């Protein structure tokens, strides 16, 4: 199972969980994080990621409890996207002012660009502090952006195997032509032959 599918499955298993007592912000997620009795939508997301084996030390070794901290981390680490994918961390800005008010996990993307997300600390009448884990349908106007906590490995092309270079074949040496050959006078070298020939022509040496 891929990391995105694993995160979605873990979040889905939490649907229906409610804080107790109501209105207290007291949850098992807050106890796990070490910060209970506080708004817990971001803590819920951190919990689901950690349970899937993804520990993002955004604010603490366990993740983040404050939505803007998550936004800054994803943006700084170039994992911030404008279009959703399943398993993304979705940040909402209800007023459209660029400030994250709430966070959840994308479960599915609809053809009309809306999403189904699983969110902690929400309710039908209170989007950001409702005290329950729920599935919510959200429209694009509410999206601030999407953090992608998964590093997708890109295939690296295998370099071609270098073939050993063949040494150039040596060309056989051509035998000198008759015109290139010098007359052989015994064991005389070429300069000696020329010298004797000149002397013979000048009458300084008898011809054998």
Specify the residue positions occupied by each region the protein language model found.
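Intrinsically disordered/low-complexity terminal segments and short unstructured peptides
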Residues: 1, 26, 59, 77, ...
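Secondary-structure junction/capping motif
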Residues: 2, 26-27, 56-70, 139, ...
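Residue-level marker of positions within ordered structural domains that often coincide
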Residues: 16, 50, 95, 122, ...
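N-terminal capping segments
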Residues: 1-57, 159-164, 199-208
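Aromatic- and glycine-rich peptidoglycan recognition patches
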Residues: 100-208
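Residues in intrinsically disordered, low-complexity segments of regulatory proteins
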Residues: 31, 39, 72, 79, ...
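...with weaker cross-activation on analogous glycine-rich loops/strands in unrelated enzymes
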Residues: 8, 54-127
């Amino acid at each position: 199972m891929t990391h995105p599918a694993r995160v979605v499955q873990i979040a889905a298993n939490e649907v229906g969980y409610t804080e107790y007592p109501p209105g207290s912000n007291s949850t098992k997620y807050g106890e796990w994080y070490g910060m209970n009795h506080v708004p817990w939508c971001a803590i819920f997301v951190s919990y689901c990621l950690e349970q899937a084996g993804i520990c993002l030390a955004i604010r603490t070794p366990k993740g983040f409890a404050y939505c803007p901290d998550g936004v800054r981390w994803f943006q700084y680490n170039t994992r911030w996207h404008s279009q959703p994918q399943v398993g993304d961390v979705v940040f909402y800005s209800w007023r459209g002012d660029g400030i994250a008010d709430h966070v959840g996990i994308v479960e599915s993307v609809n053809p009309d660009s809306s999403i189904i997300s699983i969110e902690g600390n929400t309710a039908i009448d209170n989007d950001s502090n409702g005290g329950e884990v729920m599935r919510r349908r959200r429209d694009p106007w509410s999206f601030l952006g999407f953090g992608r906590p998964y590093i997708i490995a890109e295939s690296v092309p295998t370099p071609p195997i270098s073939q050993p270079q063949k040494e150039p074949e040596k060309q056989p040496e051509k035998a000198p032509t008759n015109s290139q050959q010098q007359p052989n006078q015994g064991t005389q070298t070429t300069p000696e032959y020329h010298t004797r020939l000149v002397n013979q022509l000048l009458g300084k040496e008898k011809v054998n």
